[in-house]
């Protein structure tokens, strides 16, 4: 799995953890091991510009996903996963820090960025949260992936509660 993390934000973030949790999420979703993903970490000004340009919404947001080949997880266990370019995930540590502090289970900026990386991966794979049933599916899957990764890493304490709506 080729995953690049490029921090352009000027904020120190745990790039290795973002890489690790993205890799874990893609493996858990059975994405082809030769697929490619890019994660870019930007400051609030850059994120605001992307948010306005692509969503026509003011202000910075926490995470944006830009799919390329529209890869989807295999439907059956014996299906061969497709290979390709997943796309780009853009994260904003300034928004992540605020959300981590405001979350029901307060957590660090890095923990929020890990959660957002999984959220971005799921969006690249076609998951959404516009409708209540879609939201339940996506957020349930997101929690299972984050919990599984945290358990594998031996991390204790409550998992970050979703702050993405």
Curated annotation (Swiss-Prot):
PROSITE patterns: UPF0054. Coiled coil: none annotated. Keywords: Cytoplasm, Endonuclease, Hydrolase, Metal-binding, Nuclease, Ribosome biogenesis, rRNA processing, Zinc. It is an enzyme of class 3 (hydrolase). It is found in: Cytoplasm. Gene3D superfamilies: Metalloproteases ('zincins'), catalytic domain. InterPro entries: MetalPrtase_cat_dom_sf_prd, YbeY, YbeY_CS. One of its GO terms (cellular component) is cytoplasm. Its EC number is 3.1.-.-. Binds 1 zinc ion. Its main location: cytoplasm. Zn(2+) binds at residues 119, 123, 129. It comes from the Bacteria. It holds the Pfam family YbeY. One of its GO terms (molecular function) is RNA endonuclease activity. GO terms for biological process: rRNA processing. Its cofactor is Zn(2+). PANTHER family: ENDORIBONUCLEASE YBEY, CHLOROPLASTIC. Single strand-specific metallo-endoribonuclease involved in late-stage 70S ribosome quality control and in maturation of the 3' terminus of the 16S rRNA. Belongs to the endoribonuclease YbeY family. This is Endoribonuclease YbeY. It comes from Streptomyces avermitilis (strain ATCC 31267 / DSM 46492 / JCM 5070 / NBRC 14893 / NCIMB 12804 / NRRL 8165 / MA-4680).
């Amino acid at each position: 799995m080729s995953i690049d993390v490029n921090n352009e934000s000027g904020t120190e973030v745990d790039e290795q953890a973002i890489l690790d949790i993205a890799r874990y999420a893609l493996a858990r979703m059975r994405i082809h091991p030769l697929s490619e993903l890019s994660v870019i970490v930007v400051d609030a000004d850059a994120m605001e510009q992307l948010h306005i340009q692509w969503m026509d919404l003011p202000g910075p947001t926490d995470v944006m996903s830009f799919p390329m080949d529209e890869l989807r997880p295999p439907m059956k266990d014996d299906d061969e996963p497709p290979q390709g370019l997943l796309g780009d995930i853009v994260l904003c540590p300034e928004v992540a820090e605020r959300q981590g502090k405001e979350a029901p289970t307060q957590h660090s900026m890095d923990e929020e960025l890990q959660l957002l990386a999984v959220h971005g991966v799921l969006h690249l794979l076609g998951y959404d949260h516009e409708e209540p049933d879609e939201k339940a599916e996506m957020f349930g899957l997101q929690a299972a992936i984050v919990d599984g990764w945290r358990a594998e890493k031996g991390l204790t304490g409550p998992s970050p509660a979703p702050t993405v709506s």
